[in-house]
Amino acid sequence: MCGGKQEVFDRVKPILEKMGSSIVLVGPVGSGNMTKLANQIIVAVNIAALSEALVLATKSGVNPENVYKAIRGGLAGSTVMDAKAPMMLDRNFDPGFRIELHIKDLTNAQNASKAVGMELPMTDRVLDMMKKLQEEGLGKCDHAAVLRYYEEQENIEVKR
């Protein structure tokens, strides 16, 4: 997720390739940052949707692990799902990417959207959920703990 001039990108690309596997020049200076914000929106909304679905399954009496296994290979499957569903099912909210950091990124996305006159209703909703969890002392937990927001709303716990 790089922004800048092609000639500069070409010079530093070998160094960047040692730090990551997907090195893409997305546009001029600032484009890399906007791409990072877009990524964080997608991750946050995916985690919230996964949480909502697993709580719905659990509350409906369906085994959430079986739901995950059934849908992970289809269109709803994703890298986010494969990374976060097992954590959710194991009740493992040890930080990989903390809620407090995702709050920062989503706040930056909100600010960027305001600068171009756009609303981000799904981002706003997930950000509110994360802020509530942070207020409850879960800010240092992995963002998979968004599951806890839904669990609290429905007074139910998702687990294997």
Task: Tell me the role of every PLM-derived stretch.
Residues M1-T35, V43-S78:
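Internal alpha-helical scaffold of NAD(P)-dependent oxidoreductase catalytic cores
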